[in-house]
A protein has these predicted regions:
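Compositionally biased terminal segments of proteins
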Residues: 1-193
Length: 193
């Protein structure tokens, strides 16, 4: 991840790669520790990472995946996968909205952009609706977020709060909004203490 945060200078100019960490790495930091071998990132205002910069830092392309890079050191391997692209200036797309409202967290000693927990939940609901095969896993991640942030259960992570965020921030309407809220209702809530 350091290559993304601190790329080498080229021709006297710093090559800045803006990105947001999502997926398992975000879950491990913000929700609950688990094991992940990959780092899912959303590139901001660019479609790809400079292949020469990645190679210079010791990364190789993952065979069969044009958007994934592998790094191996001291017997450990990690893959950096570009999960999506987003814009910092255009509101279109869920990852652009999540980035716009994101925050900064310390991940492996580096300050990186991450989605707010409410946006993580929304992104997981969108993923669950889009892919039935991964639905149970995505909804389990939503449940983990609810358990990790019980103080938000009556506000931003309530059914009304998530519905409002889907509608107002992500511009989800009609039947799609009803479907996503129905998925959210399926997620078990933590017991109130």
């Amino acid at each position: 991840m350091d290559v993304l945060c601190h790329p080498r200078e080229e021709y006297g100019r710093r090559r800045l790669v803006r990105f947001m960490v999502i997926g398992g790495t975000f879950r491990d930091v913000a929700v609950r520790p688990a094991s992940t071998r990959d780092i899912d990132v959303v590139l901001i205002d660019r479609k790809e990472i400079d292949p020469e910069a990645m190679a210079a830092e010791g990364f190789t392309r993952v065979a069969g995946s044009p958007h994934a890079w592998r790094y191996t050191s001291e017997g450990r391997t990690v893959d950096v996968e570009i999960a999506a692209v987003a814009s910092s200036s255009e509101p279109a797309g869920p990852f652009s909205a999540a980035f716009k409202h994101g925050e900064t967290r310390l991940v492996e000693g580096l300050r990186v952009s991450v989605p707010r927990i409410e946006d993580y939940v929304v992104l997981k609901l969108l993923a669950a609706a889009a892919n039935r095969r991964r639905r149970a896993r995505d909804l389990a991640d939503v449940q983990g977020a609810l358990e990790a942030f019980p103080e938000r259960a009556a506000t931003s992570l309530s059914i009304a709060g998530v519905r409002a965020r889907l509608r107002d921030v992500y511009a989800v309407q009609g039947q799609r909004l009803k479907t996503l809220v129905a998925l959210f209702r399926q997620v078990p809530r933590p017991a109130r203490g």
